[in-house]
């Protein structure tokens, strides 16, 4: 490929540490360098990459070029209007360190703060508040994009001439162009603490009923589910940002209600035995985690990191799955197919697939993104070791049940669904392709994910 940028060949994987492929990684510092690269790129040869936190391979391009956008990391807070302008390579971690002390919070945050702005838009990430406030793209005001010809576009959701391209880009997994900058709305806060209600449930039925009942009462809601427990017991945590009166009542050790200091507690070792996570160890962990949670507690004040990003407390926690790596199976189905939550957990138990991180959330209304994942209903995410015998066959069977119910899988977590499953479960695919073809007529952008899904 002709490029004015030095390139370094690297082996890349997603966060699941599976399906490594080699690509030439380039790290531009200016827009014109990206534009030059795109103008001279052959078809199906380029994809962008942030911090590599997608679990599968959407930020890989075997034998092609991967654009590392880490140098596009500027952050500009507009306190008067409550908005943020940021480069696509700016991480949510870096943004939080700027906005929380200033009295603002992200409109949506996924389960890790080590995601870039570009990645959050490309995957249209969701959080614990989707049932109330939608996904990240719902709060984006503008996106600056370089298309497949290297031309710059300013995309906004409400402009009739750019709206379709905007929504194709949000959730489009980097396949409509290179996101270089975005402006999005923030939410005001008066403290950096979360007022949290916690409740334990001994079975899945009552847990899910409580989640439905709380849809209108809590801004944030998430449940941890014991995947190895037959009735599906779990711990439900719900809450909202604490106000100043609540902060004063807790006799805080800090004099600053907006104090924010996220810290990693340790680092997982680089080499762990492949059998460390098994049914026995996960069962023991799940028992301890369930018993550790209070039966019922209201109004506990928690810091941002333990509530929103608990796994960020251990650097490189993905290493605990050993050299074979892991995958996350995350689906969404309508409320009418809520029984698939239990059926999925049962199928994983049957083949002995241990998941110590199994998360259940509620989704609200979908947005206009044709490839955006959320839709009204239930979303279950289960992390499982990739080497479990029979796992792929079981997931193929679950795929069909999800598709039959009108559901779909999350592209940012996917590492194995078929092209047929994808086409069947994303009804907006053809509309997305039309917008993609307008922005990238030579089909310069491609990833290992898009190759597998034949898009």
Predicted region positions:
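Noncatalytic alpha-helical scaffold of FAD-dependent oxidoreductases
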Residues: 1-455
């Amino acid at each position: 490929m002709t490029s004015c940028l030095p390139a370094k060949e690297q082996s890349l994987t997603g966060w699941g540490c599976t399906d490594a492929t080699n690509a030439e990684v380039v790290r531009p510092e200016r827009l014109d360098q990206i534009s030059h690269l795109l103008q001279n790129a052959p078809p199906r040869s380029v994809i962008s990459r942030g911090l590599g936190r997608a679990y599968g391979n959407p930020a890989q391009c075997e034998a092609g070029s991967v654009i590392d956008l880490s140098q596009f990391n500027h952050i500009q807070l507009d306190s008067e209007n409550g908005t943020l302008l940021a480069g696509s390579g700016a991480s949510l971690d870096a943004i939080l360190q700027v906005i929380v002390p200033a009295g603002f919070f992200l409109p949506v945050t996924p389960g890790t703060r080590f995601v870039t702005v570009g990645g959050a838009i490309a995957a249209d990430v969701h959080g614990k508040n989707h049932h109330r406030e939608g996904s990240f793209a719902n709060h984006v005001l503008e996106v600056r994009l370089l298309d497949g010809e290297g031309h710059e576009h300013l995309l906004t959701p409400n402009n009739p001439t750019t709206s379709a391209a905007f929504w194709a880009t949000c959730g489009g997994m980097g396949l409509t162009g290179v996101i270089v900058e975005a402006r999005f709305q923030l939410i005001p806060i008066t403290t950096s603490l979360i007022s949290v209600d916690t409740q334990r449930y001994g079975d899945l039925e009552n847990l899910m009923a409580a989640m439905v009942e709380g849809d209108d009462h809590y801004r944030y809601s998430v449940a941890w589910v014991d995947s190895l427990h037959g009735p599906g017991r779990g711990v439900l945590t719900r809450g909202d940002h604490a106000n100043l009166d609540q902060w004063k009542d807790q006799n805080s050790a800090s004099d600053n209600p907006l104090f924010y200091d996220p810290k990693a507690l340790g680092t997982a070792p680089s080499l762990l035995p492949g059998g460390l996570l098994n049914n026995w160890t996960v069962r023991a962990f799940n028992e301890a985690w369930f018993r550790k949670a209070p039966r019922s507690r209201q109004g506990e004040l928690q810091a941002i990191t333990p509530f929103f990003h608990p796994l960020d407390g251990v650097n490189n926690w993905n290493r605990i799955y050993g050299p074979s790596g892991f995958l996350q199976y995350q689906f969404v189905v309508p409320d009418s197919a809520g029984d698939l939550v239990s059926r999925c957990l049962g199928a994983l138990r049957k083949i002995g697939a241990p998941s110590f991180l199994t998360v259940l959330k509620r989704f609200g209304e979908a947005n206009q993104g044709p490839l955006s994942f959320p839709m009204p209903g239930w979303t279950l995410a289960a992390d499982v070791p990739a080497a479990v015998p029979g796992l792929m066959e079981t997931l193929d069977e679950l795929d069909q049940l999800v598709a039959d119910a009108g559901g779909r899988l999350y592209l940012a977590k996917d590492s194995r669904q078929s092209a047929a499953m994808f086409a069947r479960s994303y009804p907006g695919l053809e509309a997305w392709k039309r917008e993609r073809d307008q922005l990238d007529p030579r089909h310069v952008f491609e990833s290992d994910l898009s190759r597998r899904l034949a898009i």
